[in-house]
Amino acid sequence: MDCALAEKYKNLTHEKEICKKLSLSYYSIQIKYKNLFESENCEKECYRFIEQHFNCGKKMTAISDILGTNEDIKTLSESIRSVHMVSLYLLGYSLYQCFEDDLNKYFMQYIGKSDRGEEYDFRYTWFLTALFHDITSCKEVITKHNEIEGKQSIENVIKSEKNIYDYKLQSGKKFIPKFPKDFVLRYLKEREEKDRVDHGIVAGYNFFNSMCTIFEQKLGEEEIIVEKTDKERMLMWDKTYMDHFVFIADAIISHNIWFDEKTEKMVGKWAYEENPLNFILCLLDTIEPIKRFCEDKRSTLKYNEVLENISVIKDDERKIKISWNDVIRNCELEKWERWKDNIKKLDEWMKIDVEEGSDFLILRW
């Protein structure tokens, strides 16, 4: 088998990183594999890892606005979803060379360079996307216990003044989302009728509202502010970053919308060239294995065992090879088949080619 995810997660480096002897995330946050995936409290360690990124960037309000109570935080920090989000982030980080240049070119069409001429860093976009996309999964099911809160979160979306659908980019161009506003709100209401809060839509709306509010309060009338933090690190607040946030919010909002229950048809095939960040999130969210193999207490495999027995590597330009060994198949046959089938069916709703071998899948787009 090619390099296992466990080995990749332990040895992640980035070409823009000054220190390459440590596995570092954005803000030079250390990626401590054993803590995240082998400790007794993996879920809490992963939640701390998520918090650390938003705290370091002084964006923690985005999480506290949506996880309004200690009970919410407790639920998420004890949930597999926190581990899934971290694994998804590290999976994307390990494959950044597949996407970074394409995303940079795409964003340059709409956002351009900041006044300081800083180069684009995939890790910034990706940590905000991956570590937030399932943040409201702890509130997804509407019950008698949380009915008022669940319906209020939906109402907040509907009444939100700051939203991606009314947003104009700094260039003056109007932002064009993956799905129109009416369709998204209809989809949200249809989910509510089934006692579900679509966690992607609610998270994406809240992300955009919170991030824009944070930056507006910090910047005031200024275009750019460079702030020195407690750890002698420089933190930049740039108005053009709000353009960045609208693309991230759109990816989060749309990442669960692939089937229209009203028409009982797929919503159309997603194209990499048209919405690359949305495409990447849905692609890797489907591939990320922890969510599938460890989703219930009956799972026989631990988090690290899943990552040690699955490989996901860049095989060529716009080509990923996913392979596994017999441990995965023999221990969790039913979950392995479901995970593999979900990946194989990506070509039903994404413009992607899937090739199957005896112990691997190859994806081309």
Report residues per predicted region.
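C-terminal effector/catalytic modules and regulatory tails appended to multi-domain proteins
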Residues: 1-65, 284-287, 293-365
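Acidic/His-rich, divalent-metal-binding segments that scaffold phosphate/diphosphate chemistry
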Residues: 2-178
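Detector for Asparagine
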Residues: 11, 35, 41, 55, ...
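Charged/polar, solvent-exposed surface patches and flexible loops
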Residues: 52, 65, 90, 205, ...
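Generic detection of long, well-ordered alpha-helical segments
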Residues: 82-85, 197, 242, 277, ...
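A general structural signal for alpha-helical elements within enzymatic catalytic domains
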Residues: 97-100, 208, 212-215, 344
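Divalent metal-dependent catalytic cores for phosphoryl transfer on phosphate-bearing substrates
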Residues: 119-304
